[in-house]
Amino acid sequence: NDIATLALDSSGESLHKRGYRDKTNLAPINEVLAAGLVLLSGWDKRSNFIDPMCGSGTILIEAALIANNIPPGYYREEFGFQRWEKFMPFEEELWNTIFDSSINKITNHNQTIIGGELSPNVAKKAKENCKLAKVEDIVSIRNCDMKDFEVPPGKGVVIINPPYGERMVKDNIDELYKMMGDTFKQKFAGYDCWILSSNMEAFKHVG
């Protein structure tokens, strides 16, 4: 037991925390998971992207970052390695070169990225997060129920992280999933629709 391991923290605050999300609802989705879902969906970055139950807007914001080549660490104030002065002097000039190279790759496409949120307060939080992420001109947030969502013409991808667990009482879950399935069939023809859920019983009601 005479062996010790010494490690240096190169990241600082956890890397999944992008730095843009100030306002959250209950049980918000992890930013890295949200980005992974967008990539897994095969979205082409040009067609419509919709989250009609957007909560605090994380999935929509990550879609906007991916579509416009905005680096995931763009909003972080610093990383742990920037304070390694005694062990390994921080090379600010090299860092600025790397940072500027990433920034120069940012594009400004006109995607249609839209979210819907039933709660006025949560919809407001989503809009505030979009401003913090500087994508408020790309992402549009509507205060509406999913079944009343006005779907833009064309095709695209829908990703939903529906309420679950502490965000919803159990008796309403089956009804919610049935509503999602009905809305997909009635309004989202031509869209690839994804639902993030571990509730296999509830999935039976999607149809």
Each model region followed by its residue ranges:
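Class I SAM-dependent methyltransferase Rossmann-like catalytic core
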Residues: G19-I29
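Conserved Class I SAM-dependent methyltransferase catalytic core
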Residues: N110-T112, G116-K125, E166-G207
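Short, internal active-site loops enriched in acidic
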Residues: D2, K147, N199-A202
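A short, flexible beta-alpha/helix-coil linker loop
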Residues: E13-S14, P163-R167
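Non-catalytic substrate-recognition/targeting regions of SAM-dependent transferases
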Residues: N1-R21
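A short acidic, Gly/Pro-enriched loop at the edge of an enzyme's catalytic core
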Residues: K147-I159
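Beta-sheet entry/capping signal
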Residues: I3-T5, R46-F49, T112, V157, ...
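Conserved S-adenosyl-L-methionine
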Residues: I29-E150, E166, D174
